[in-house]
Amino acid sequence: MATFVIVHGAWGGGWEWRSVADALAARGHRTFTPTLTGLGERSHLLSRSIGLHTHAEDVAQLIRWERAQDVLLVGHSYGGMVTTMAASMVEEVKAMIYVDAFTPEPGQREIDLIDPKWVESMLLEPARRSGDGWLVPFPFPDDLDGFPADVAERYRTARHPLATFTDPADVDPRVRTLPTAFIHCTGKPPGEDLFAGLAREADQRGWLIEEIASGHDVQIEGPAAIAEVLHDLASRM
């Protein structure tokens, strides 16, 4: 049995990983899917003070208070920024798993890892236009057309604190000595894969590489597939 802590991406919440957690539990694994401060069912805590450190501390505190050991720490998308920093705060992480996720080095910000044209159109301009300069609405509402209605509605109404994308990651070099895997979701339209370059870098680093023929939100589009890959990685890391 492995212990997974799975951290969701921007505009999301732990709710979107529940099907994956259930599938892992059926295989005997212990799985936590926390929701980061200001998002999902914790959206009532949304404030200007929330930054990347806040979210990393959310995860570190979960690991401490649950007395979790030998944790397989999984980050999806923006969640990779969070898990990398959280792993720098605690000693209980056994291995890192990035699911179509950002993989920062010390001092890097998420906006440093995205094409500048996407930073402006996806984050900065929407925050100026409709987020009082500090909140980012969900930038891809048209991409939700194939999702279940309740899932699409949760994303469409979500807002994410901009500071989490512009704060630098405080990364202990020790984190990069941990066994690490990168799961690349390869079913995205041409020209819209923000993570293809990061997948190549992960391969060059000698990390374990897995591919799933899914869109970016594999936890919604293919929960059984991602659960199977995570289950397999648990025996290899």
Language-model segments: residues:
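Active-site nucleophile elbow and catalytic-triad environment of alpha/beta-hydrolase enzymes
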Residues: R154-P173
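Flexible "cap/lid" loop of the alpha/beta hydrolase fold
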Residues: M89-V93, I97-V136, A163-T164, G191-G197
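Gly/Ala-rich beta-loop-alpha elbow adjacent to hydrolase catalytic centers
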Residues: V74-G79, T83
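Glycine-rich His-Gly loop
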Residues: V7-A10, S77, A101, C185
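Active-site loop/oxyanion-hole signature of alpha/beta-hydrolase fold enzymes
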Residues: R30, L36-V71, A87-S88, L113-D115
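Conserved loop-alpha-helix segment in the C-terminal half of the alpha/beta-hydrolase fold
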Residues: T186-I220, D232-L233
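Catalytic His-Asp charge-relay segment
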Residues: T177-H184, L208
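Conserved HGGG/HGGXW glycine-rich cap/lid loop of the alpha/beta-hydrolase fold
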Residues: A2-S43, M89-E92
